[in-house]
From Swiss-Prot:
Protein's UniProt name: Photosystem I reaction center subunit IX
UniProt cross-references to Gene3D superfamilies, sorted A to Z: Single helix bin
Keywords annotated in UniProt: Chloroplast, Membrane, Photosynthesis, Photosystem I, Plastid, Thylakoid, Transmembrane, Transmembrane helix
Any one annotated GO CC term: chloroplast thylakoid membrane
Gene: psaJ
GO biological process: photosynthesis
Pfam families on file: PSI_PsaJ
Function comment: May help in the organization of the PsaE and PsaF subunits.
InterPro entries: PSI_PsaJ, PSI_PsaJ_sf
Domain of life of the source: Eukaryota
Amino acid sequence: MRDIKTYLSTAPVLATLWFGSLAGLLIEINRFFPDALTFPFFSF
C-alpha cells in the first residue's frame, strides 16, 4: 500500500492528472461558450 501511495504521488502521475483535468475543463468551457474571446463570467 505504501508503494502505491509513493507511485501515485510521483511527478509524472500528478502531471498527467493535472493536465487531464485542465484539458477537460477547457473542453467543457469551449462546449458551453464556443469561440469565445471573452467569457461572460469573467467580465466585470
